[in-house]
Amino acid sequence: MKTYVSNEYDVIVVGAGHAGCEAALASARMGEKTLLLTISLDMVAFMPCNPSVGGPAKGTVVREIDALGGEMGKNIDKTYIQMRMLNTGKGPAVRALRAQADKWDYHEEMKRTIENTPNLTLRQAVVDDLIVEDGECRGVVTNTGARYRAKSVVLTTGTAARGRIFIGELNYSSGPNNTIPAIKLSESLERLGFKLRRFKTGTPPRVNRHTIDYSKTEEEPGDKEPRHFSFTSRDEDYLTDQTSCWMTYTNPKTHEIINENLDRSPMFSGDIVGVGPRYCPSIETKVVRFADKDRHQIFLEPEGRKTEEIYVGDFSTSMPEEVQLEMLHTVAGLEKVEMMRPGYAIEYDVVDPWQLTHTLETKRIKHLYTAGQMNGTSGYEEAAGQGLIAGINAALSAEGKPAFTLGRDEAYIGVLIDDLVTKGTEEPYRLLTSRAEYRLLLRHDNADLRLTEKGHDLGLIDDDRYAEFLAKKELIQEDLDRLGEITVHPTIAVNEYLAGLGQTDLNGGVKADVFLRRPRVTVEDVERLTGQKLAGDRYVKEQVEIDIKYAGYIKKQEIQVARLRRQEAKKIPKDIDYDQIEGLATEAREKLAKIRPETLAQAERISGVNPADLAILSVYVQNGKYAKVQK
């Protein structure tokens, strides 16, 4: 096809899913002339699977995105239909906010934000090729022949990259939700020498809400207490008219139908070769893998206020359409349900993430960044977090400024990216709280304290919001100091209160911060018992209470972080030749040469690099032997 020269930009972002939207908005807000290209303008920030945002670890990522100046938290706070805090009976490190989204409102609101953002142009196009000159990415070529040039390019192709949908024996080339797949871009990446692999994900059927017998299901209402993802959202705007979700279960009859039709499932017939997600398996995989279980939970989740579609959560399947309906009709409450869309599996290309740096720039081609599901992750939140970092770094690169990264001790986003680039992934990667060594420091409640200053330095947090943040920090310190001054006396009221908690009496006066360390004692109780009011609002008080109650554990993790930072400060030269280092185990040598860690701390986290290998490497890097092993 004949090509033509179109416009020139500072940054081009390919794909307008959750990663692409954050990347493009970050770049434009940092002052870069940005082009956002998407296969379909009707799919901007679309939710092809679960109509929700947040959950364990993921919810904290959304708060981190917001603290850095990203959009996902604001967007869901404008478009949710239900909000719930999960794990409220557990410690603060694992509490998680989850919102049920109106997926159509979410898409429309994000598209409106993008269209109204200065420096940002949104266009519909399929990108077929990259413009690469002297090992640097300098633009893209679309299927209509347009050549757009740029200083940096961010790819966020999601599941559209050579996507193929499977429904029983039927399979066809497609992106998510029957959109156009991106075929030639994958071929372009392979020609450039990138290693691609196939992953698989899936989605459940959607059913008509009016054909469900809700009397046979369990209601899951939203929280009455105001909750928000964005630190800028106000309690007075909290939605009181929330939409419930509903829970039901599969049963032995459901499992019998699944087992009888496994030969028709592309997951088991061999038609699907892509690796599926461990933590979000299809219902047929769950039935086979957990054959001892008589039932599995199913969540019925509304997709929005203006649609009749209900998402059948935890029921992902690629069975033939008629088998899906037969399966649904065995479930309590769904005996007469009408299916509006069948579930399907989708295979797609991913870039092996060891080919990336911590900035999400590719090692092979300079000024080319990748983010989202094409890096091997699953989930909207993981994608958005990567997109934000890739967009920030694409903008910084366009300006010739130093790159921006987040450490494992600074954010779940840092954990996610570090896991990808130092360990790679053999399956769709899902962020879990257990992946974070310092999760007590990386909480839902303190994301602003960790990251707002960084967002302000990048130009993504405006001065007004930054001033509010500084005022909050001052109030936290003021209330911490105040609790160190207030005395709680052993009054009758105090000891009756303690008896009600099953605790021993107070024999003498103690400072309020010491009293607050007792289990189940709250800041509000201290205020009531002493008659002394603190200055902060409920969010400040929450922070104060956590800081005091968990001070010892937080201190331990801060000591561990100090050790990590010492190791991170020990840089490994880029041109080191691992073949010349004597004593390294073969596996360690191969892994180090493949991943090429930037610091000793990163090398330590690579699977296959043992302590002995690390000690040898450390000697070469730190003790003057490096010159002997230069390439």
Curated annotation (Swiss-Prot):
This is tRNA uridine 5-carboxymethylaminomethyl modification enzyme MnmG. It comes from the Bacteria. Its main location: cytoplasm. SMART domains: GIDA_assoc_3. It is found in: Cytoplasm. Signal peptide: none annotated. Keywords: Cytoplasm, FAD, Flavoprotein, NAD, tRNA processing. FAD binds at G15, A16, G17, H18, A19, G20. InterPro entries: FAD/NAD-bd_sf, GIDA_C_N, MnmG, MnmG-rel, MnmG-rel_CS, MnmG_C, MnmG_C_subdom, MnmG_C_subdom_sf. One of its GO terms (cellular component) is cytosol.
